[in-house]
Amino acid sequence: MCSIGEDDFGDEGGTHAMVAGSVPSGIDLSPGECSKCDISSDELFQLNFRTPECRDCFLAYVRHKFRAALGAAKVLPRDAEVLLVVDGSAESLVLLDMLYYAQTQNTFKRLHCSARMVYLEDQPVQGRDPADLESLEALSKRYEAFEFYVITLGLPVGSLKLLKDYSPVAQESNELIQKLSQLRSLTSRQDYLQQQRKNLIASVAQKLHCSHVFNSSISVDLATQLLTSIALGRGGSAALDVALLDDRLAAGIKLLRPLKDLTEQEVQFYVHAQRLQPLLMASSRYGQELGDAASLQNLTSAFVANLQKNFSSTVSTVFRTGGKISESTHPEQAKCNHCQSALDVELSDTLLAIEYSRSVSEAGVRLNEAIEDPEIISKRRMKLNDELCHACSSIEADFKNGS
C-alpha cells in the first residue's frame, strides 16, 4: 500500500503570492546532478526535507501524490464522469495539468475516467473584471482533450456555456451580489458565498451528468478550513470539510480533493516546472483585502499562515488531526437545508445562550417593554431554525437584521 510521508509539509512558500516569471526559492538554475537518477540537469528542485532532484524526478514524485490519494482509498470508480473545477488559481491549474497527464498515459498507467472542465468565474462577485477570454482560450487549447465550460458564480445553472459560446455578463444581473450586500458581517458573506459556490458546482455536475467533482484544495487550505469550520459552529461536520471524499453535495454527487497532500512549495515548483500561467496572480478570496481582522475566515487564514511561517510543521499537524476526526452521524439524521451538514437537534445550552444574547441585543431599549421573556423568545427562534445548522442560522439571522 502506498504511503505519503508526513515530513514534507514544512513549506514557507506562498502559492497565492507568486509573481509571474519569478523562480521559487529552492530551485537551483545552475547545472547539477540529480540525487535520484544521477543524471546531470540544468535545474534542480529541492523541496524541504528532500534532496535536490531533476525536473522529471520531481514531477514523478508530486504526481504520485495525486495518484496515491485517489488510488489508496479507491474513491474514484473506473470510467467515472468527473467535473474538474478551475478558478484560475495556481492550485486549480496544477490539478488540471495532473489530470491531463494521467489521462494521456498508456493503458496501464492511465487514469480511467471521463473528465470535463468548468471555469467558475467569481471575479464579478468581488467587483473585479472577469478573466481575459484570450487566457481562457489558451488554456482550453493546451488541454483540448477536455470539454471547456464556463459559468459565472451567482447566475443560474442554465447560464452554463461552452467557452466558444461564452461572453461576460453584466454585474447588475447577478442576484448573488445583491444578496451579499444584505449581509452585515463579512464573516456571513464569506460563508454564504462558499455555500453558494458548492451548490452551483453540484448543479453544474448534475447538468453535465458527472458523478464526481475534483476540488483543488491543498494542505494549507484544508488546515485553514478545519479551524474555520470549528470557529463558525460547524464542528460536527468539520471532518468532511477536510476529507478526501465529501458526499454532502446534492443528487449524490461526490466531491474529491486529490491535492490534499500537496504543499504550497510543491505547487510553486510544479507551476515553474510545467510553465503554467495562473490567471490569478494574487490571493483573490472575497473580502481578503479588508484585512485579517475583518472576518473569522480572514483571521483564521492569517493565524495559520503565521504559524506556518514560524513553525513549519503546523499545517501538517492541523491537517493530519483533521483527517483523524470522524463524523458522528447516522443515515436517518436530518441535514441542514443550506449546507447539507448533519443537524444536531438537541437543545444546547451554549446555542441557547448565544440566541439569548442575540435577542437581548436586538431588543435594545425596548427590552423593558417586552412582554415575553428573552429566554422564551430565544427557544422559539431556535425551533424555527431547526432545519438549519448553527452556522447557517447565523447567516439567516444576519439576512433579517441587514434587510
From Swiss-Prot:
Pathway: tRNA modification; 5-methoxycarbonylmethyl-2-thiouridine-tRNA biosynthesis
Transmembrane segments: none
InterPro entries, sorted: CTU2 (IPR019407), Rossmann-like_a/b/a_fold (IPR014729)
Any single biological process term in GO: tRNA thio-modification
Pfam families for this protein: CTU2 (PF10288)
MF-aspect GO terms: nucleotidyltransferase activity; sulfurtransferase activity; tRNA binding
Subcellular localization, as worded in the UniProt entry: Cytoplasm
GO-annotated cellular components: cytosol
Keywords, alphabetical: Cytoplasm, tRNA processing
Domain of life according to the entry: Eukaryota
Protein's job: Plays a central role in 2-thiolation of mcm(5)S(2)U at tRNA wobble positions of tRNA(Lys), tRNA(Glu) and tRNA(Gln). May act by forming a heterodimer with NCS6/CTU1 that ligates sulfur from thiocarboxylated URM1 onto the uridine of tRNAs at wobble position.
PANTHER family on file: CYTOPLASMIC TRNA 2-THIOLATION PROTEIN 2
The family this protein is said to belong to: Belongs to the CTU2/NCS2 family.
HAMAP family: CTU2
Name of protein: Cytoplasmic tRNA 2-thiolation protein 2
Organism: Drosophila ananassae
Lineage of the organism: Eukaryota, Metazoa, Ecdysozoa, Arthropoda, Hexapoda
